[in-house]
């Protein structure tokens, strides 16, 4: 229902307009206060790159963060990552991730990013505290990438990157809750790069698509072509589950059942195993896998995806960030 409201298919969005006006007024006032320096943002001693979005829901932001970190690492840049840690609750903040950190403590995305990249990752509701924690333990870090946080103006930033779902884009264009917007589309004029996940990019936007890899067994790490798996049950606890199910079908998989889960939903063995009958194979997102690895069965697999950016602009963006980081 919420997707239909946000897309404008359902007329119910009009009933929510008063709340959206209030949301827009408050969020606009907050940004204006920082712009006019009525409130002061904290500036890190190293460059900060924000990878965020204008809308609620999944846009492919985390794969972009992973791509960015890996690309900078390949260029010899030491990168740290900070996040709010949605879906997790640590005993105290800031929390610097380690090999023992769970998704219950740090949230899904930070654990995924840490496991994929090996970069220092810290979470805190106050992102400046997360930055300080990384720099205290890793003083050689040259640049910070923040996963989400475009609207977290308490942390000053040097580069802003926005990721857009190229198919859904901005729906009916209204602020939450009548629409999906955290900020209006005009905010794109002030950011440094716009990356469009799927769909047809517009002038000045960087095209991106998510390239699926081989399926990975959660228990053994064995890899195979996902199309070789039989009697598949697919689950996805991400911002936009239909995207994952569509990816599976694009890979030649016809799931016997698709189960969308809430983003950041906590998972346990009993609930997940109940979704699969004897003889079936469970396939999930990598984000779900970081929550299930500790109690996975032999027939549980995940499908990793990598961001693939096209055109000349990604190289220019990376050159800009490398230059920024090298100056510190």
From Swiss-Prot:
Q: Keyword annotations for this protein?
A: ATP-binding, Kinase, Lipid A biosynthesis, Lipid biosynthesis, Lipid metabolism, Nucleotide-binding, Transferase
* PANTHER family membership: TETRAACYLDISACCHARIDE 4'-KINASE (PTHR42724), TETRAACYLDISACCHARIDE 4'-KINASE, MITOCHONDRIAL-RELATED (PTHR42724:SF1)
SUPFAM superfamilies attached here? P-loop containing nucleoside triphosphate hydrolases
Q: What is this protein called?
A: Tetraacyldisaccharide 4'-kinase
Q: Which family does it belong to?
A: Belongs to the LpxK family.
- Note the superkingdom of the native organism: Bacteria
Entry's Pfam families? Answer: LpxK
GO molecular function (one): tetraacyldisaccharide 4'-kinase activity
Q: Summarize where ATP binds, as residue positions.
A: 55-62
């Amino acid at each position: 229902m919420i997707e239909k409201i946000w897309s404008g298919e359902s007329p119910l969005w009009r009933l929510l307009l008063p709340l959206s006006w209030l949301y827009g007024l408050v969020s606009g006032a907050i940004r204006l206060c920082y712009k006019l320096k009525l409130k002061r943002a904290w500036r890190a001693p190293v460059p900060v790159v924000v990878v965020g979005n204008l809308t609620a829901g999944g846009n492919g932001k985390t794969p972009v963060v992973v791509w960015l970190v890996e690309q900078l690492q390949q260029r010899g840049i030491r990168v740290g990552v900070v996040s709010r840690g949605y879906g997790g609750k640590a005993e105290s903040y800031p929390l610097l991730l380690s090999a023992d950190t769970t998704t219950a403590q740090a949230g899904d995305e930070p654990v995924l990013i840490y496991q994929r990249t090996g970069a220092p990752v810290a979470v805190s509701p106050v992102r400046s505290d997360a930055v300080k924690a990384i720099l205290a333990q890793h003083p050689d870090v040259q640049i910070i990438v923040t996963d989400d946080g475009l609207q977290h103006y308490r942390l000053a930033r040097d580069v802003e990157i926005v990721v857009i779902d190229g198919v859904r884009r901005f729906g009916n264009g209204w602020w939450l809750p009548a629409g999906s917007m955290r900020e209006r589309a005009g905010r794109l004029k002030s950011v440094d790069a716009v990356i469009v996940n799927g769909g047809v990019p517009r002038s000045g936007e960087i095209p991106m698509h998510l390239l699926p890899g081989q399926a990975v067994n959660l228990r053994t790490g064995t890899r195979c072509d996902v199309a070789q798996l039989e009697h598949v049950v697919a689950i996805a606890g991400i911002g936009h589950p239909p995207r994952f199910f569509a990816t599976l079908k694009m890979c030649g998989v016809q799931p016997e059942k698709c189960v969308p889960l809430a983003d950041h939903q906590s998972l346990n063995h009993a609930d997940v195993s109940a979704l699969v009958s004897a003889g079936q194979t469970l396939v999930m997102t990598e984000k779900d896998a970081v929550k299930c690895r500790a109690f996975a069965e032999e027939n549980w697999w995940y499908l990793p995806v990598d961001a693939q950016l096209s055109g000349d602009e990604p190289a220019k963006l990376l050159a800009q960030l490398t230059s920024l980081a090298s100056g510190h």
